[in-house]
């Protein structure tokens, strides 16, 4: 067994690419570390590995090495990662939303816990004046972020989308270098046209009866670069009629996996990215995001969740496979944001094992829709997607457990207390 571990370590070192960030948009799938590693575990990934084109798999793994000053150094490895290959990002769009909402609050000098009230937008979304999940019964950016990161709440994202505004949302991300990203619509709501999603509700912040900020209803006149993305081989339209042609995804949200991976890196390691790439957040903002990302639903009081539905690993796909049972024996925390819809399952994660001083970043997406029909809800998330994510995370984790490090990481920045 020791010889096998040493053998794979030698193969890994031979395949290492020490570039901090690969500029190419299409990363070679063959003769890479990840390709070698997946082949070594071929039986565990059959039939997924045998038909990676069908499953549209993309993987990015970041090895993290610390120096004597605990500064992180990154080595990225890609498997079939291609910024030109479309996948529906689903709820992963909520990751930049939480950061941009906090960034906007900082620009306005408003605390994240300040009550935020949203006016109605006729025919699109209703007003929000109360929030029964909050301790004080009032909506706020902080409460929306909790619900987004703990259980991937759709309405919470939509309210942040409305606060940020479609045009500002995209321009802010493009200015940070995420030029392939397009956030064009709310999520989890049918029947809103692309034009309707350009409109966002009026928002106000009030504390103790005092108006702190009033934002009028906004309209985005942003011109998006044209796209020709498609999904599936057939789909059910809004009238529940089967259309026997691919769904036009050119007006859907879009985030390449590489952009998601870099967004998470910017949040987890803000000091390791350039100032232009960094979200304008305070240290307390980062600590709040880390806390919400890594917290389990049963550890939350406000909001409080029914743990029969929102179980321990409800949003933990990589390594934990979204399994209800908890049998890990070490202190592992996952800082992540997943998304699943239209047969696409994506997870973007920073994984820590505090007991064994292990840390790594792993992002992956897989398409599990055997019949090719969208909106029929016949997707293989449980039978194919979640087991794939669990095993992929486990393989990288086991490799990291065995990998020798010159300097063990000090992970105290990410050690949280979850008692409330």
Regions inferred by a protein language model and the residue ranges of each:
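C-terminal motif of bacterial Sec signal peptides marking the signal peptidase cleavage site
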Residues: 14-15
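Extracytoplasmic
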Residues: 52-56, 74-76, 82-84, 88-93, ...
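Active-site SXXK
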Residues: 87-116, 362
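Sec-dependent signal peptide recognition
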Residues: 2-9
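Active-site-adjacent helix/loop patches that line small-molecule binding or acyl-intermediate pockets
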Residues: 25-45, 49, 53-55, 133-269, ...
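A short, well-structured edge-of-sheet supersecondary motif
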Residues: 39-81, 114, 362-364
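Structured C-terminal helix/loop/strand segments within mature extracytoplasmic catalytic/sensor domains
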Residues: 20-46, 51, 241-420
């Amino acid at each position: 067994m020791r010889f096998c571990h040493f053998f794979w370590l030698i193969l890994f070192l031979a395949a290492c690419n020490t570039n901090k960030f690969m500029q190419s948009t299409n990363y070679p799938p063959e003769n890479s570390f990840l390709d070698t590693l997946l082949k070594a575990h071929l039986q565990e990934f059959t039939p997924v590995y045998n038909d990676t084109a069908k499953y549209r798999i993309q993987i990015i793994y970041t090895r993290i090495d610390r120096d004597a000053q605990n500064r992180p150094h990154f080595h990225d490895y890609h498997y079939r990662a291609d910024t030109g290959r479309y996948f529906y990002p689903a709820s992963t769009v909520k990751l930049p939303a939480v950061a941009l909402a906090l960034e906007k609050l900082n620009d306005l000098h408003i605390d994240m816990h300040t009550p935020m009230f949203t006016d109605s937008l006729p025919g699109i979304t209703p007003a929000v004046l109360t929030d029964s999940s909050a301790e004080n019964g009032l909506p706020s950016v902080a409460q929306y972020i909790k619900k987004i990161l703990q259980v991937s709440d759709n309405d919470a994202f939509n309210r942040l989308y409305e606060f940020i505004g479609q045009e500002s949302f995209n321009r802010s991300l493009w200015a940070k270098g995420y030029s392939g990203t397009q956030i064009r619509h709310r999520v989890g709501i049918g029947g809103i046209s692309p034009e309707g999603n350009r409109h966002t509700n009026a928002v106000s912040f009030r504390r103790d009866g005092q108006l702190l900020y009033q934002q009028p209803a906004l309209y985005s006149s942003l011109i998006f670069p044209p796209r020709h993305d498609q999904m599936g081989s057939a789909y059910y339209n809004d009238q529940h009629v089967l259309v026997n042609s691919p769904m036009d995804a050119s007006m859907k949200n879009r985030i390449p996996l590489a952009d998601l991976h870099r967004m998470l890196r910017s949040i987890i390691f803000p000091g390791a990215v350039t100032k232009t790439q960094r979200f304008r957040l305070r240290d307390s903002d980062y600590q709040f995001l880390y806390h919400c990302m890594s917290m389990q639903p049963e550890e939350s009081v406000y909001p409080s969740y029914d743990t029969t539905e929102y179980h321990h690993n409800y949003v933990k796909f990589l390594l934990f496979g979204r399994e209800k049972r908890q049998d890990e024996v070490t202190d592992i925390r996952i800082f992540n944001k997943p998304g699943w819809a239209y047969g696409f399952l994506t997870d973007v994660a920073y994984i820590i094992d505090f007991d064994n001083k292990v840390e790594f970043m792993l992002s992956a997406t897989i398409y599990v829709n055997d019949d090719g029909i969208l909106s029929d809800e016949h997707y293989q998330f449980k039978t194919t997607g979640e087991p794939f994510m669990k095993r992929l995370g486990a393989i990288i984790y086991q490799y990291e457990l065995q990998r020798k490090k010159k300097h063990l990481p000090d992970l105290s920045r990410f050690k949280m207390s979850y008692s409330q």
